[in-house]
């Protein structure tokens, strides 16, 4: 049993480090095709899209990238992965997207008693939901590090391991902790896929807004240029997780600007697409929905949660 605060913190860091590195390293096969396409000069200069239609493809490579069952399978088709990479970069460069269809389709789910997650692809130039899966847990059934609602890792992985332009999850109308701001666990989980170059962005969809976590392609290119990109990805995710955790335990009130500034320091953007009835920008006076939101998930509370989890685990 962990006895002191420092012991608990050390245990937590070790646990998180193992979880992040293990999941990043085992996410899927990094193939030479992916590395060559991401690192080729055209992808940096913005010319990849021009080259997609050149040359002849073999019958085995005629599938569109959205037809593959996993990112690993897609990565084995150089032509198809190149098509995806070009489309992904074009979308991230412009981000001129209308989310009305998605918001309309999710309206009833935002009043549910749990979170939902799924995939979105561009169909005729418009974002459309192509898969949606509910969390098996109702709000409050499986509290994890202060979360009011959650999607377990196995459900999220089942969705995120399939090729899609966007992956999303909902923050339903359950209270102050389920607003539009991503949780620290949301960020650390989705970065495992974003830093691989898988998906253009992860969306957090609430009644108030659509928020998108995305990574500039140059950050991805720099990671892939390293001899061991997966270890570098794991290190970056752990750095961000601990920076957000420590800053959030010290800064009160915790605002959207605080979150965005830390993420931007690491080359990650959190972009908000407001709805017509709710407008939010860089207003430092605007707190995230309530006093409760700004105060929960301090480092001490996180350590207390960890002790509770350990106690339950040791008694089973």
Swiss-Prot record:
Keywords, alphabetical: Late protein, Virion
GO cellular component: virion component
Induction profile: Expressed in the late phase of the viral replicative cycle.
Domain of life where this protein originates: Viruses
Subcellular location: Virion
Similarity section: Belongs to the asfivirus F317L family.
Protein name (database record): Uncharacterized protein F317L
Native species: African swine fever virus (isolate Pig/Kenya/KEN-50/1950) (ASFV)
